[in-house]
Design a protein with these regions (language model features):
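Active-site beta-strand termini and strand-to-loop segments that position acidic
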Residues: 80-82
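Long, contiguous binding/interaction regions
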Residues: 1-29, 43-53, 57-62, 69-72, ...
Length: 116
């Protein structure tokens, strides 16, 4: 599945369960490992796990491949590896602490809010 199609599926799956502050970062020029990072916030461990599960389910339904999922035990930060896209679903305090957007050192102009 191509990256733009996969991105749309991921964003729609996150929006379905009311993820907040969904952000897509193009990492294709920063690393050969994946093309995009999608970061979203959830209000609770239960919502974090539900969002990650919905991404997993929707990608699988569309014929996509799930490489792996990490962090579902605590639900503070759940990562879903889809190969060309890595999805991070985080509770707000964890997101503020790790600042992945800054870690990838992308200026605000090259980041964009996710759209379906």
């Amino acid at each position: 599945m191509d990256t733009p199609t996969l991105e749309k599926i991921v964003v729609a799956a996150l929006e379905d369960i009311k993820a907040r502050d969904i952000e897509v970062i193009d990492t294709s020029k920063n690393t050969p490992l994946f093309d995009r990072i999608v970061i979203a916030s959830a209000e609770s461990g239960r919502q974090t796990r539900a969002l990650a599960q919905n991404v997993h389910d929707k990608v699988k339904e569309a014929g996509g491949e799930i490489i792996g999922t990490e962090g579902q035990d605590t639900g503070e930060w759940v990562l879903v590896d889809l190969g060309s896209i890595v999805v991070h679903v985080m509770q707000p305090a964890v997101r503020a602490h790790y600042k992945l957007e800054e870690l990838w050192n992308t200026p605000l102009a090259s980041r964009r809010a996710a759209t379906r």
